[in-house]
Structures are given as C-alpha cells and as structure tokens.
Amino acid sequence: MKYVGSIDQGTTSTRFIIFDERQRPVSVHQVPHTQHTPHPGWLEHDPMEIFRSACKCMSVAIAKLRQKDASFRKIEAIGITNQRETTVAWDRVTKEPLCYAPVWNDLRTYDITKKVTAELGGGDSMFASKITGLPVSTYFAAFKMRWMLENVPAVADACRRGTLCFGTIDTWLMYKLSGGKAFVTDVTNASRTFLMDLRTRKWSPELCEKLKIPMETLPEIRSNSELFGYVETDECGVAAALNERTPIMGSIGDQQSALFGNMCFEKGEAKNTYGTGCFLLMNVGEEARFSKHGLLSTVGFQVGRDGPCYYALEGAIACAGATVEWMRRNMNLFSHITECEKLARSVPGTQGIVFVPAFSGLLAPYWDPSARGTIVGMTLKTTRAHVIRAALQAIALQLNDVVGSMKRDAGLNLSSLRVDGGLSKNGLLMEIQASLLGVDILVPSMHETTALGAALCAGLAAGVWTSLEEVKAVSRRENSWKTVSPSGSAMEREAMIAEWREALKRTKWAKL
C-alpha cells in the first residue's frame, strides 16, 4: 500500500492527514493554534507556532500509522494546502519571522487599500483588476506586505539589507521544512496576492513597482503538482519519523484544493466549502474569466509545469462557521455544535427576522468593508431558535447571491453543487441551500476533500496516480455522495430573498 501525506494548514488549526492509494484517510493528527487579536479588526498568527504545529502533526500522524500498519515504510510524497492570503515576512539569513502574520480576514490594511486605489488612479482600479482578476481589498496578500513594509521596522530593515522574504503560508512551510532551500509558491496561492498576472502566471513587474513590493522578496511560482523541495528539518522529530528524505510534491490553496479534492476537473463543475468562511469555486476552463459581478477571477489548478491551467471564478463569504461559533461562544445560544441544527429545526421559520453576519464586512459579491453584523425584525416573541435558523439562512442566502453572479459571469448554469467543510454536515443548512439554488447538493461520505486535494497533487507528481482519469475512477469506486434535493415553493424562496435584500441595506454601520 502506498501512502501520501497532506498538511492542511487552516485558519484555526493545522492537521496532517495520511491517505492511502484508495484515497482513504488512514491517520490524522490536529493541533490548534492561537488567534491573536491585538486591536479591533486585527487577526494575526505566529508563523513559528504554525510551523511547529505542522511538524508535530506529521510526527504524531506517522507514529499512529506505524502502530496500525506494521508494513508501513514511507510516505511517497507530501502535499500542502493552506489558508490563503495570510502573509508571512521573514529574514532569509536568520530564517526567523519578523512579525506575526496578518490573516486573510484581517482589516488593518484598509487605509493601505485606499492609498493604493489613489496611486493606481482612483475609481475601481480596473487597470490592476484586469491583470490580477481581483479587486483592491484588505483580503489580498500584497496589501499586507505593503502594510508590513510601512509599519514594521524590522521588515523595512530587512528589505533595505536585501534579506527580506515574503510568502503565504505554503511558502513559509516549504521554506522551513526544507531548511531554507525551497523559496517557492504555487499558482493558486500566487494568484491571491494581487501581484500575479493571471494570464502569464508570473509576477507582474508593473504591479510590483506600483505597489512598492520588491520582486526579489517574492518566491518562484510553480504549478500545483511537481517537486518543490524535500523535508530536511528535524523539528519535532519529523526527519526521524519520515525515515528517509521525503519530497514535497504538491502545493495548493485551500479552496482550490477543495475544488480538486471534489473532482471538479471539468468546466462548469463547482464546489462550496462551508468552513470558517464560505467559498464557492466554479471551474471555468482553460481561459480566465474576468468577473463583472463582484467575483474573483483566480487559478483553479495546474497539474505539472507543462500541464494546462484551469481557471475558476470564486465567491468568498467571510463568516459561515465563524457565525455559528459566535453564536455558541459569544452569545451562549447553545453549548455544542450538534445542538445548532436541532434548535433551528424546532421552529418552522425565522418569524420575520433576518440576520446579516457581516462581522468583518461583506465580501463577494458586495465588497462592503463598512457593513457590520445586523439582526432586523426582532420582536418580543423572537427566541434563540429563530436567531439560529436566521443565521443558517444567511449563510445560504449569501451563497445564493454568489451563484447568481457566477451564472452571469461564466454563462453557465449549475446542475448540482458539491460541498464540503464542517457545516456541510448540517442537514438543515443543506436543505435550505438546495431550495434557494434550485439544484441538488452533493455531500461526500469522505469529508476530508480539502486535504485530499493536496494529497492528489502530490500523488500525481509522485506517480501514485497516473492521471486525472485514474483519480476520478478511484474516487467513484471508493467514495459515495449523499444527494439533498430542493423543496419548498418559489414564492417562499422569493420572499426570503426579498427580505434579505432589504436587510442588506441596513448593514452600513462602520465609519471607515
């Protein structure tokens, strides 16, 4: 039996999952990491904590597999999938981070985005968007780089000395795991920086100059499935656990990894991940589609340096699982995640309330950083069950708006939607989603599709699987999908959407 490992580095934790050649997860270890919030709107991570967590997860998961399988000898290859946009700055001499890493949904760069918009000529910065496929937003890595250069003296000093390295989490992990030998990224992560030309898949000299990001601080861009380097660190006993020099042969941003792990290899196929945020991606084929309706144009995946590049349209929602966690932890509406669906099902509707969970602004397709969390329509009869149900509806309603934009941009209709992520296990949410979209929702029996995507990238490069056709054939043989079909009337659907649109108008609260 051959095994492939996947480092799944997310917003709240790091995991290492080992898959066998039948695409089944056979060993896993997970370690949470600290969420640092030094100021309102800020969220940052300790890069060294993330690196050590990854190493710990690898060592423990491998040890667990050795106990299960006495014949286990090696991991054929390792893939990495990661929270995108979160940006690390480090010194190439010391190999140590120069500050904590601003996370993808951190809002500290709002003033930087206003400054950059002015520098690019004002308006909606269409010049840059036509290169990158992205709007100017606090979301993307380039603005975090610019903020660090202007506000962190150690970063500015390293830049002057020529020792500064910038990278997203994939780059940071590969750099540290390889002992500083691999300073690389992949096309999906690079496409989320606001510095990569989407058509050429190379850094744009013009944008780097305009945003004042020195190109020498950026890593080499590669495909998602090829040799990136070898694991050479012995942090937490990783080298000893692996038993031999193990190649890193896959790297892919988390949402693209979920697209790949959900087998969306063909044009028009789409997936949604219900995680901390909510992320819908549609494969639009080998030609980039530039959105006119508030979506992101991005790289979907590229298998091999000379392989075709498949592009995607993406709609990102900031708060999905984060909304459920807010209700549990901050508001004490329930004590365990399993109670969420039960309470929401205890009422037939929301009794007229609408919840807009814009805790850190609204992303696609609205792009409104001034929006804040809003609940409208409450009365003395409103209960926690109504609020919880309204929160689930809000997640589905935001996704419905994203799908509407995607249909207009891609000129393609959804025939079904593949889903993954923790909230895909919430049956009521899946029912609401199917009814709003009017298509079947396909829920996989094997929920680790994000980690699987990176493992597939690594395994394809290592020869564990020889083609996408073989990957799909194995998946059809080994995995199954539950279908959730639409229900309810068109009148109910339209009424829900109309109330949602009215509630959105009331969310502009923050004075930025």
Curated annotation (Swiss-Prot):
**Entry annotated with the keyword Repeat:** no
Q: Which residues bind substrate?
A: T11, R84, Y139, D254
Q: Where is this motif: Microbody targeting signal?
A: 510-512
GO cellular component terms, semicolon-separated: glycosome; mitochondrion
Q: Which reaction does it catalyse?
A: glycerol + ATP = sn-glycerol 3-phosphate + ADP + H(+)
Q: Does the keyword Hydrolase apply?
A: no
Origin, by domain of life? Eukaryota
As for pH, the annotation reads: Optimum pH is 8.0. Optimum pH is 8.5 for glycerol phosphorylation and 7.0 for ATP formation.
Write the Enzyme Commission number(s) for this entry. 2.7.1.30
A GO MF annotation of the entry reads: glycerol kinase activity
Similarity-based family: Belongs to the FGGY kinase family.
- PANTHER family documented for this protein: GLYCEROL KINASE, SUGAR KINASE
Q: What does this protein do?
A: Catalyzes the phosphorylation of glycerol using ATP. Under anoxic conditions, when glycerol 3-phosphate accumulates in the glycosome, it catalyzes the reverse reaction, maintaining the ATP balance. Key enzyme for the survival of bloodstream forms under anoxic conditions.
Its recorded name reads Glycerol kinase, glycosomal
Supply the gene name.
Answer: GK
